Amino acid sequence: MKVAIVGASGAVGQEFLRILAERNFPIDELVLFGSSRSAGRKYTFKGKEYEVKLLQHNDDFKDIDIAFVSAGGSTSAEFADTITKYGTVMIDNSSQFRMEKDVPLVVPEINAEDALTRPRGIIANPNCTTIMMVVVLNPIEKLSHIKRVRISSYQSASGAGAAAMQELQQQYKEIIETGEAETISKFPHQLAYNVIPQIDKMTETDYTKEEMKMFYETQKIMHSDVRTSATCVRVSSLRSHSEAVWIETEKPLEVAEIRKVLEAAPGVTLVDDPQNYVYPMPLESAGKDDVYVGRIRKDLADENGTTLWLTGDQIRKGAALNAVQIAEYLIKVGNVK
């Protein structure tokens, strides 16, 4: 299997290298691609050093079987035809193609089969907050159809990339040394000791693009008419996102039956003993593969409502891991060139 990583120097690109090694992904040859800024950098994979090649419009992808692409929407749009020209499967981490009808949007625990129909050779990886939420919603949907979901997300700095993590750390350092944060470029405001109730650009409805992604992507992945309403907030933690989720189902569900299906669900770890201070926290889910869920309880305002809390590493399951799992599924069913 010949594999490429486009955007190898970024936070998700680096996570691809770790996950592919950890899972012993079947790679005979690995090629790393990047922009002019990262071309020439060297990274080690399974004891061997690889140099990042400049991404160009040429025949570099002619013999590539799978390309993991995490270099931003504009790069995905510009190079999609170049990458897929000779039959390479492009698994794209950007938002560029997610809502296009001829591009499947896939979370393997839910709709892996959708990846088999890809007329453009592209499979889209969903938004990180969407992935973590639907992995938890799907087992509940099997108990009773979910009508509405309301979410407040608490998203760490790493969701904005490696440079954003560095900026947050730099802000804390500056505050300790001088009393104020001087480095503010990756976020619209100081993030250290703060929360920012905006992720991505505002739309004309005053919902952000991040919040609208959750609305549309959830419906597409789950093949459902479920309606979601989200408030996405950037918080001053480094890694791992959290979400407070309110779920309205067609019929009332007992907490015990929800716990039971979540405990058995693939990709989910139940952490739910709040009387003993046991519940999911981003500090503990960082670096882990599963989505952690707890604080499961009946909603006090709606007899058909359930509320819960989840956390997950958005660079792993929210990005690189989900893409690798898609590729593993394609290999398992023999659906790669």
Report each predicted region and the residues it spans.
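N-terminal Rossmann-like NAD(P) cofactor-binding subdomain of oxidoreductases
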Residues: M1-L191, R227, K260, V291-Y292, ...
